[in-house]
C-alpha cells in the first residue's frame, strides 16, 4: 500500500510539474475555406501530445491584408503571436523578424521537403520558415456537364474554354438562371496577380519581371493574354467575377452554378464532401494555354514560421515541426486535399486514393511559375499591387490591355528606381 501511495505521489507530482511547464501558444493560421478547421485539428493534436495549449487567432481572409497586419505586429516586435502561417512570397519581406529553425528541426527532416521551397524560405543563410503545403493553380470542371454537352476532355486552350463555357452556360440557364460558364479570382488583390501571371505566361508572355530584374510585362503576348481574358467577362464569366476571391469563386462552383473554375487544390476536398451538390462530378486538369503557349500554374503555398520575439520559442518551433511533418501533411492531404511539400507523399497510396490528381498533375505542381518575389525583394508588394491594379482596370474595362501594360511598365520602372 505504501509502495502504491509512493508511486501515486510521484505520478501526481510529475503531472503537476508537467502542468507547471505547459505553455499557451498563439497561432495565426488560416481563414480560407476549411483551412481554419484543419489548423485547429493539427494544433489540437500537438497540444494533446505535449500537454500545451494552442490558441488560434482569426486573421484577414485576403493575403494582402494579412501581410499588412503581420508587418505591423512584427515591426513593433510584438510577442502576441508565436507562430505565423506565411505566404511563399513573404520570406524576403518579413524574414528578419522570424526565428532560424535550422537549430530546432533536424536536417534530415528539412531535406525531405522540396528543395526549391526550402531555398525560398532561407533568408540570409537562415531557415526562417518550414514548408507546410504547396499550391499551384488548376482548372476544375464538371465531368457530368462535359459529357452532357458532348465533350470528351477538358479545354486545352483558352479559346476552347470560352467556347465550351458559353455552350454549357446557355444550356444550363434554361433551368438555372444563376448558372455561369467560368469563375476565377478577379478581385483586385494578390489572387489576381496569381491568375494574371498564369494567363500571361500561358500565352508565352513571360513574367512581370524576369529573373535578371528586367521589367518584361509590356509585350505583345501579354497584351494578347489580357485581351482574351477580358473577352471572357460578360460572355463566359459573370461581370461579378471582378469581386471574387478564392472563396467567392468556390461558393459559386460548389453550389453547382458553374461549369469551370480556376482555384487552388484545397477546393477539391470541399467539393467532394458529403452533401455537396457536385460531389463525384469534379474533374481537375491543367489550366488552358494560349496559342502556341504552354499551360502555366502560379506557384502558391504557405509556410510556418516562429516569431523571433516569441516568449516560448522552443515550444513554438516544436509545434511547427509537428505540423510540417510527414504524418500531419499526410492527414491534411487525405482529409482536405492540401498539397504536401514532402515528395514521398505524392507516391503514398492513401494520398493518391483520396486525391487522384496529385499523381496526374505532379508535373504541374513541381514546375509552377514563381511570382517575382525573389528578384524584387522588399519591393515585391508594390510590384504586385501595381500589376493587379493594372489587370483589374482591364477586367473592369476601364482600360485597354495595351495602354494598361504600357502605364504599368512606367510604374514598375519608378518602383525599381536604381535597382530592386
Swiss-Prot record:
Keyword Transport carried by entry: yes
Source organism, top-level taxon: Bacteria
Described function: Probably part of a binding-protein-dependent transport system.
Annotated Pfam families: SBP_bac_1
Protein name: Probable ABC transporter-binding protein DR_1438
Keyword Transport listed: yes
Keywords tagged on the record: Signal, Transport
Signal peptide: 1-24
Record family assignment: Belongs to the bacterial solute-binding protein 1 family.
